[in-house]
Curated annotation (Swiss-Prot):
The keyword DNA-binding applies. Pfam families: PARP, PARP_reg, SAP, WGR. This is Poly [ADP-ribose] polymerase 2-A. Residues 434-660 form the PARP catalytic domain. It is found in: Nucleus.
Length: 660
């Protein structure tokens, strides 16, 4: 598609789409071709959705719940749906450049795919008549030198404003942001009440995936109150409404609590024992810390801070990598999580446990293929853990296979690690003069970089190279740095297993988002709320003797090629060897300390190395085991007591993905 373009033209096209424009011509061509194919697929999806919506005569989402727009009248509180049924169809008929011009004329960002620009236009406030302007007026209405053209070229920047415990919604008008804050009242029996509510509702059958925000506002000078509402499709701006001003706090609270009850069928005062109702919104519990983790600069140490820190340069670089909230947000967005509706810094443990609980119930019915119940439970999961699916049909995202269940389970696990990380990174008691060093101290680990020529470094490099499985051919790996690591208190807990037989040095990989939590808290076993069917050999901590098996769990990509893995000394003792899945494997037979999921290929045991302190390093080249014909290609080792684990090394690696 793009091979005929010159390099500068390729770069321009990629930059116009907000994509990475680095690399040589073949890389640029592949990247642009992939973007164009994606745009074409998205355009087809938008076109189909617009046709379906026009045929049905109803809204895709929002306050209408699918009602015919022609029959709907303006609500008393101003919460009406879009006025024109044909907006989506009109926008779909416009060219990409015309859509960009229209977006700029409304002060909106004009980058991204055609579908993204259309969604932005559909969800942003349009002209006073609610319709789409004539495309010719947009494309040709301004002369080249017109000041309005320059104004249109300025992309509108939306900022978050925080006063007190809660952040003002980003779409509240600027003049209100400057003079109001979220109402916070202290009561003798209840303590602080923060009048800020974010709610979600996903109904797969009705193609609903929508949010509702309510904030009671108090003027900074006191004496004036308002209530702000915003609602719409998850991932879109939606519509909003300001109620007031009210002269008394009680009026604003009455309006806020009335709206909350109307949307959820729950009383605000009883929200801690919230009950979910069909076709009603579910309240998303927020954790109001003392600092805003999304905007506080200290959570993402910069390059300048690395230069100023007392940390050794290699350690500083690694800590900066794993303690980066922006990275965490980006990685979660890539797997579908919507951090705008439930910011990572506001995650509460109860939300994580609710996510696990719904997945557990899905696991109980997934084998029965009960489509109706799976739709209902999937909607419940996406309500608790918000996802941005754009305007795609929700039926495409039903959690109806063990693979999909496993993917969502891994997402909730990552959110659990991020919940720990954000609490860690928000701590105000740390050294503000050297925040990177403060982050390091909070991990409660001692890191020592290994030198390239050292014996330990060479051993680990050999272990890595030899145990890259022949089925894992889509990437190679470069070692960026290897650290010797000691977690505070871990050796003492491990001591009772230090002389146990069969101690091995094994791999453990995980998402980049998870490492601040893992290093500070140690490797942990899934909570009771998690479904056992998500774990092949029961709930435990899983390890591998093949590097690439663990490396796959880093979920690196072209966009983020960094990965982190652990090498742990694991006291396996006598193992319970299994060829196939057993979700109750954690109930070990008497005398067994661990489970081994037996693979068809494993490192040649004759080539293993034994360290001076008696730890087996299975660094031999892979060898097929014809007699072992279970369901696994490679071995897995599982322990059900975290005291059997001692972290020994941390590896920072870079993935090189092969051309397809």
């Amino acid at each position: 598609m793009s091979a005929r373009l010159r390099v500068e033209e390729l770069r321009a096209e990629l930059q116009r789409r907000g994509l990475d424009a680095s690399g040589n011509k073949p890389v640029l061509v592949r990247r642009l071709d992939a973007a164009i194919r994606k745009e074409e697929e998205e355009e087809a999806a938008v076109s189909a959705a617009a046709k379906e919506e026009a045929d049905a005569g109803g809204v895709v989402d929002g306050e209408g719940n699918g009602e015919d727009k022609r029959k709907r009248k303006r609500r008393g509180d101003g919460e009406d749906v879009d006025n024109s049924e044909s907006d989506a169809a009109k926008l779909e008929g416009m060219s990409y450049r015309e859509l960009q011009a229209l977006a700029k004329s409304r002060g909106l960002a004009a980058n991204g795919s055609k579908k993204e620009v259309i969604e932005r236009l559909l969800c942003a406030p349009s002209d006073t008549d609610g319709g789409v302007q004539d495309k010719k007026k947009i494309a040709k209405g301004f002369a080249d030198g017109d000041d309005r053209v320059e104004e249109c070229r300025k992309e509108k920047i939306v900022t978050a404003t925080r006063k007190g415990a809660a952040v003002l919604d980003q779409h509240i008008p600027d003049h209100i942001k400057m003079t109001y804050h979220v109402l916070q009242v202290w009561f003798l029996l209840k303590g602080d009440e923060i009048y800020d509510a974010t709610m979600n509702q996903t109904n797969v059958g009705d193609n609903n995936n929508k949010f509702y925000i309510i904030q009671a506002l108090e003027s900074d000078a006191g004496g004036s109150f308002m209530v702000y509402n915003r609602w719409g499709r998850v991932g879109a701006r939606g519509q909003d409404k300001l109620h007031g001003p009210f002269s008394s706090r009680e009026q604003a609270i009455y309006e806020f609590e009335g709206k909350f009850h109307g949307k959820t069928n729950n009383h605000w005062s009883d929200r801690k024992s919230f009950e979910c109702y069909a076709r009603k919104y579910t309240w998303l519990e927020m954790d109001y810390g003392e600092a805003d983790r999304e905007t506080n600069k200290k959570v993402s140490p910069s390059t300048d801070q690395i230069k100023e820190t007392k940390l050794e340069t290699r350690i500083a670089s690694f800590i900066s990598l794993i303690c980066n909230i922006s990275m965490m947000k980006q990685q979660m967005v890539e797997i579908g999580y919507n951090s705008d509706k439930l910011p990572l810094g506001k995650l509460s443990k109860s939300t994580i446990f609710k996510g696990y609980d719904v997945l557990k119930r899905i696991s109980n019915v997934i084998s029965r293929a009960d489509r109706r119940q799976l739709e209902q439970l999937t909607g419940e999961f996406y309500t608790v853990i918000p996802h941005d699916f754009g305007f795609k049909k929700m039926r495409e995202f039903i959690i109806d296979t063990p693979q999909k269940l496993k993917a969502k389970l891994e997402m909730v696990e990552a959110l659990g690690e991020i919940e720990i990380a954000t609490k860690l990174l928000e701590d105000d008691s740390t050294d503000q003069d050297d925040p990177l060093y403060a982050r390091y101290k909070q991990l409660s680990c001692d890191f020592t970089p290994l030198e390239v020529g050292s014996e330990e470094y060479s051993m680990i490099k050999t272990y890595l190279a030899n145990t890259h499985g022949k089925t894992h051919t889509s990437y190679t790996v470069d070692v960026v740095q290897i650290f010797k690591v000691s977690r505070h208190g871990e050796m003492e807990r491990f001591q009772k297993f230090a002389t146990a037989g069969n101690r091995m040095l094994l791999w453990h990989g995980s998402r980049l988002t998870n490492w601040a939590g893992i290093l500070s808290q140690g490797l942990r076993i899934a909570p009771p709320e998690a479904p056992v069917t998500g774990y092949m050999f029961g709930k435990g901590v899983y390890f591998a003797d093949m590097f690439s098996k663990s490396a796959n769990y880093c979920y690196a990509s072209e966009a983020c090629r960094s990965g982190v893995l652990l090498l742990c000394e694991v006291a396996l003792g006598e193992m319970n060897e299994l060829l196939n899945a057993d979700y109750d494997a954690n109930n070990l037979p008497k005398g067994k300390l661990s489970t081994k999921g037996v693979g068809q290929t494993e490192p040649n045991t004759a080539e293993s190395k034994i360290t001076d302190d008696g730890v087996v390093v299975p660094l031999g080249k892979p060898k097929a085991e014809p007699s072992k014909r279970g369901s696994l290609l490679y071995n897995e080792f599982i322990v059900y007591n975290v005291d059997q684990i001692r972290m020994r090394y941390v590896l920072h690696v870079s993935f090189n993905f092969k051309k397809r």
